[in-house]
Amino acid sequence: MTLSAERPHEVEKESFVPPASNAVSRRRGGGWLSQHVGTAIVAGFLGYLLGHWLGNYISSGYPVVTNTGQNSIADLMALIFMVVGWLAGIGALNYPLAKLVGREAKDDVELTGWSKYFRFNLDHKVVGLQYVLGVLLFLFTGGLLAMAIRTELLNPTTHVFSADTYIKIVSEHGTIMMMMASSVVIGPLGNYFVPLMIGARRMAFPRIEAFSLWVFLAGYMVIFSALPFGGFPTGWTGYAPLQTQAGPGMVSYLFGFFVIGLGMMAAGFNLAATIINYRAPGMTWSRVPVFVWSILATAALLTLATPVLVAGGLFGLLDKTVQTAFYVTEHGGSSYLWQNLFWFFGHPEVYIMALPGFGIVGEIIPVFCRKPLFAYRIAAAGMIGVALLSFFVWQHHLFQSGIDPDMRPLFMLTTELISIPTGFIFLVGMGTLYRAKIRFEVPMLFCMAVYFNFLIGGVSGVFLSDVPVNVTVHGGFFVLSHFHYTIMGGLIFAFMAGLYFWLPKMTGRVMNKRLGLWHFWTMFVFFNLTFFPMFIIGLLGQPRRVFTYAKNLQTLNDFSSISAFLLGASFLIFFANLMWSQFINPKKSPANPWESLGLEWQTATPIPPHNFDRIPVIMTDPYHYSEAGAPALADFGDDDFVHTSSGSTTSGDGSA
């Protein structure tokens, strides 16, 4: 059977041969003098020392360096030089520096083996796995801080930490988790699978992609460095005047946001350029996978909203170092300026986190329902609608902090309106599940949990959009529970679904199903037992970020804390499964274990560096499950093999 006469696009599809000008050499290692994570750490440390010395020298002529009387110039210079040293040590600056001095950049070396995961690499698949490691590092660190928080809240009178230490732990936990969550899907799964799903051989700008990863990791180190400097007491929102009054740890917070913001902008721009310009022939917008739609909407938010955060962080750094007064009220500034800048980014950021999770679920459930995705166009439109409306709701975070009362009804309305496109996305999932013969594999269980958790988080969000309710419960545990249900209950559960679904393709090794089931049920049960009581605690008046509370709330807090410890243990099951399945007792995965129609499953495993020997021509969308006579997903230009609508690969005569 041949499809060559039916191709919608006549394109040249020769076997892949790397151009001579872009040829790469292959070797297993790089030697101790080559650039890798070790040299990056050393260069970053030396850069920190040099920057601190230079900052002290520059600021020595200032009688008063900052509004707090501290030498924040030296702190900032140290962090800047640390990041530059880190990037230089990993090799991220080799190419631009060579071009800057007019020299030809050296050919890239394509490393094999484990060494490639600890170096600057231009393969989007390697970058995706590097992001996985980085995100898991964020998650582990933030999780340990969460355990410390719940340990303190076991007793309202017997304290593990001082009040000052407690608020700094809360602040560090919130900031690390928010920055991790901003990249938890778009970094690992977006970078890895978007080119595969659209039939591309690479990202539009591979160096920018790799650069965004190492900047992301540098931002993590900058934010985590706040703890040795005494932390910051502002919570993850960094509100002034606490921001301007805080110690040197605040510089780490502001510069960390600045650095991670640069990486987020680079990632968003690169993903958008790739999706718009690198789709395979025949992949019209109505054939783009729903996960790619979610990444495109997220990339638009990253590109448009993140510059506001970067500018806001820069203003705060100037206030801390050279005595400008953007947020210093007594010198003519306004603390409301930071709140507006922060939340103009901060609420789109909620959907930067949520939209990729919706995309993962929309991509997975048709596979295990063996049904086409219900109302595909509505799902895509819902994601675009959420992205657009997310820019018009940020003022609901200021209902109590000085917003003009006449503006409250407008932002209450826009906040309620955003539930409409979100509801469309939710109903698309319900329509797909309706009357389906569902296979309850581990990825599908996590997807079902996403709908359950996000329904609770979404309904509680509708209450919070109402001004009287918001004013009543603002600053309490009700808001905290709502937020964790939407972000952790939605995004992190979706990320786990994506890992269990796609890791067999990423590594060629299947995860242990029994451990996966243990992980799911413990995580799902103890997540709800941890955070649902917080709705009650919040309605009873317990404030956030305070290490003591009314004695009558101890039972609920103890119940929540014990559940949180068991929730943390569920992640240990995941890490054990990861180590067992991928390293200790690896089992080779079938080429397409879930019988998915997705284009990413139609290439070889392990995936070759160039992804596809021939660029496919897309014939239809990837959701024609259980449809008799459905067309093949794509023509791969190989007359001997046809990729069928069942997800299998057959020879031209129909034999398996």
Please place each PLM-identified region on the residue numbering.
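Membrane-embedded and interfacial regions of multi-pass energy-transducing membrane proteins
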Residues: T2-E6, E10-A656
